[in-house]
């Protein structure tokens, strides 16, 4: 009898081929991160009570995080298997984001007066954690101060996600920190400027907090109140894009506010490690970085083209306003923040192509930005240039260099595979969204927006996805999560190969 005809033999071999996952580690990670959310939900609860809002949403939310956190901590405490590999890193990051999103949706579900459902609440929470910034609610002001702060803090945590993970987990699971770091950090390599990941995480956390405090202060010096300043500082430095108002930043009608937020979004899209060195008095490390120079040049170029176009179509009456709207929107889209000061659908189709290009690339590696990242774009351009050279001189050795260092063939191939998967995910998502009755323009733009964690789409989803069906919101939620975790992390888990020895 052939083995593939013996169901018992096949089942046994299949069972043996399944790798035993260190579930204690994963459960422990979930518990630790749930407990990390408790003081944050308590803060939102206090804000709700202070402004005379119902305490129920965050009261239940706090209890849910606390209960799940304690249970998972107890289940993950007595671990006998200390083996921690890449699979555990990928699973812990993905499952933790899912659990946090489900529990984080509770305050939205329990908020009285909100016309919504489970998928709207889940979409809003995932959009927050992934720093996408697309919202499922058409009337933001009706959410109340407590949920406004919750939305801002969701994005602030999501922006510094890996740092939050490592700082929280190092005391208990130091052995698995590097795998979590690799599972969630963005970029083509994972270089560290300190030998211990715990030290890296702490330094980057300090930089992140300093940046947030600085921009909150600068915003407060303008027309914003203290509450709005804190919220918008959190959502801009994290390149998240949530605003406390349905009309977005245009609510404040303040050029000063727009310029400050432009700088904040641009800062958030830069490599945090290089910013750390700049703070230490080594700005040349930032200035001489090839990715930084490409990204800055890209933003300058798109800003100039956009400004010329807006002036050509007569969108604004003064040069200053034309420049301000152009630089704000290009930085916002190019950093994957997604804050809006204007209806970009009124800027005509030519700008829509610029917007899609900005959303597609997005920010630098090691930043809070989503998207493809400029470093990968550089590799694509240089690899394409090398292929043209080989057409003329087939035997010519043409390595791909970044900052003067040669990238290995394996890394170049990995980047090419990532880009193919990235585009495939966008196309697949757009096709699924059209099945729910959405038109082509809206489907493609919102798919690009969610995979790149950029926020606004083009067409009917430029400001919110409140009118989207449950199926569309579910698809978009998956796209946001996959995009935030660098595509490979989530997609790999869905393959049979991931579970084999």
PLM features: residue spans?
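Membrane-proximal intracellular helices of multi-pass ion channels
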Residues: 1-501
